[in-house]
Amino acid sequence: MISFSSFYQQIADSNLQHWLETLPSILGKWQRDHKHGNLPKWEKVLNKLHYPAPDQVDFVDSVTVGSGEQLSPGEKEKLENLLRLFMPWRKGPFHIHGIHIDTEWRSDWKWDRVKQHISPLKNRTVLDVGCGSGYHMWRMLGSGAKRVVGIDPSPLFLCQFEAVKRLAGTHHPVHLLPLGIEELPPLDAFDTVFSMGVLYHRRSPIDHLLQLRDQLRTGGELVLETLVIDGDENAVLVPQDRYGKMNNVWFIPSVAALMLWLKKCDFTDIRCVDTDVTALAEQRRTDWMPNESLVEYLDPNDITKTVEGYPAPKRATIIAVKNQPNQDLIS
């Protein structure tokens, strides 16, 4: 069974220690709720990942574990077969002992767009909301973060993350907790909070922004990346049914509307640092994710539109700072 005890020990003497009042019971319930289904099968695979400590790691320019020279061809083949049992791999890429996990998303491209605009992460405590399998968490560690905590309720993402961590070394201060943000108390503790690719999946985007705000210390930085449309501060797309074949997309605002929402939630120093139309080369079917991908979500006769006729995915990155508490929002 995946254990979270080392995380509990690490935060016991930190500004996250009050989280220990509720976290163990919440994670215990999650484990009980998932003792059937795929999780036990994936945990058995994790228990087979017994490999020597890597001769090198790189989290600065990539997520690379091992040089590729440590394992024999047979050992490498066995490892690749084990890692393929965690398919589909969506966020990456990862380079593990010479094995290239070519994920659906080129998450390194997103990181390259974001990293130049954020406050330096050196010695910061970071929260990554909706972290997936943890690719960006490793890059945050490579940027000097003191501790990185990711939350995502998916059992598969947790096991993919655990696989990489067990191969990279469990001593790294990077932790994935299978939680949704609604399960977090107001921690007011993180120096930087990332929410990338989450907002449009939330039924109440304003509540999501307030939940993100509750995790930041005063003066902490929010890095928000989400789908946007063109238009003024009143422009918000509410898909009738699906958007890009996704049935869990609720609100897609314009950049101006999103900045107004953040202002209403009492963020300050709000600025849009990047907008980018998602390229077919950034999200695509691969050998490690053989299902439908972006090209199938777009109109085959006009890739500027989704199959439903909406504008094709365009993403913006907004950075904002948590202001002093507003009693009206708290109440």
UniProtKB/Swiss-Prot annotation:
Family according to the record: Belongs to the class I-like SAM-binding methyltransferase superfamily. CmoB family.
What InterPro entries does UniProt report for this protein, alphabetically?
A: CmoB, Mo5U34_MeTrfas-like, SAM-dependent_MTases_sf
One GO biological process term is: tRNA wobble uridine modification
Which species does the entry assign this protein to?
A: Shewanella baltica (strain OS185)
Q: Which gene encodes it?
A: cmoB
The domain of life for this entry's organism is Bacteria
What name does UniProt use for this protein?
A: tRNA U34 carboxymethyltransferase
HAMAP family, per this entry?
tRNA_carboxymethyltr_CmoB (MF_01590)
Can you state which reaction this protein catalyses? carboxy-S-adenosyl-L-methionine + 5-hydroxyuridine(34) in tRNA = 5-carboxymethoxyuridine(34) in tRNA + S-adenosyl-L-homocysteine + H(+)
What role does it play? Catalyzes carboxymethyl transfer from carboxy-S-adenosyl-L-methionine (Cx-SAM) to 5-hydroxyuridine (ho5U) to form 5-carboxymethoxyuridine (cmo5U) at position 34 in tRNAs.
Query: Which UniProt keywords are given for this protein, alphabetically ordered?
Result: Transferase, tRNA processing
**Oligomer and partners:** Homotetramer.
